[in-house]
């Protein structure tokens, strides 16, 4: 994804300047929804997606939410591993999203803005040797590697889920655990009783947090 801390306070009014588009070009000519595209930009959509992944797969939630490190594909296996093994993650088996730009808003080399990835770990020496023999990019220990795809097909993949439900009576994914929640974080001063406008809106942004913290602090979930 394309993430920068300054994007967290973007609204449907400011979203197009971050994409380098005019309002006319985006909305009138292309029919793009400013609230939806703002949710991609400010982190709401990434948090919601990783919440779903965490709760469906039992992958852990980072302690302080997603950090969006700017990492190219050839560094994924070197950096998206636990801190105890030289990486950036709080845990082994944790969700995270990477950014295609750095803090200066410059594109990083070999970015994965439009793609998806997964980090894998060898469970024995044979698999480690396979990583090496197959020319896979690994961390310094040779234990971690990454698999990525340069694109994800968004709504085009929906048909697969529909086929699975209709023909096999199976879901392609469903919630099995309650590891994570999306906290509503105010974008501006709010008044008591004010109605929030959900993801990509003007009032609040979403931050991925652990379900434990959500329950302890009685966090207000982000509305979709």
Ranges and model annotations:
Residues 15-224:
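C-terminal catalytic/substrate-binding lobe primarily of soluble NAD(P)-dependent oxidoreductases
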Residues 1-13:
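A contiguous active-site-proximal alpha/beta segment in oxidoreductase catalytic domains
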């Amino acid at each position: 994804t394309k993430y920068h801390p300054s994007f967290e306070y973007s609204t449907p009014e400011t979203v197009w300047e971050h994409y380098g588009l005019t309002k006319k070009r985006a909305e009138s000519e292309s029919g793009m929804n400013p609230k939806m595209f703002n949710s991609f930009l400010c982190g709401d959509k990434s948090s919601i997606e990783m919440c779903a992944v965490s709760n469906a797969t039992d992958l852990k939630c980072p302690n302080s939410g997603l950090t969006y490190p700017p990492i190219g594909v050839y560094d994924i296996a070197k950096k998206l591993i636990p801190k105890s093994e030289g990486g950036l993650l709080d845990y082994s088996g944790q969700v995270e999203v990477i950014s295609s730009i750095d803090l200066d808003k410059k594109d990083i080399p070999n970015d994965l803005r439009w793609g998806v990835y997964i980090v894998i770990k060898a469970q024995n020496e044979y698999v480690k040797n396979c990583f090496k023999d197959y020319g896979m990019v690994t961390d310094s220990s040779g234990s971690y590697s990454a698999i990525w795809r340069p694109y994800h097909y968004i709504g085009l993949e929906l048909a697969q889920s529909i086929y699975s439900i209709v023909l096999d009576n199976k879901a392609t994914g469903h919630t099995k655990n309650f590891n994570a929640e999306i906290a509503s974080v105010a974008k501006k001063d709010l008044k008591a009783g004010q109605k929030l406008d959900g993801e990509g809106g003007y009032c609040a942004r979403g931050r991925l947090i652990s379900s434990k913290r959500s329950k302890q602090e009685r966090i207000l979930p982000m509305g979709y």
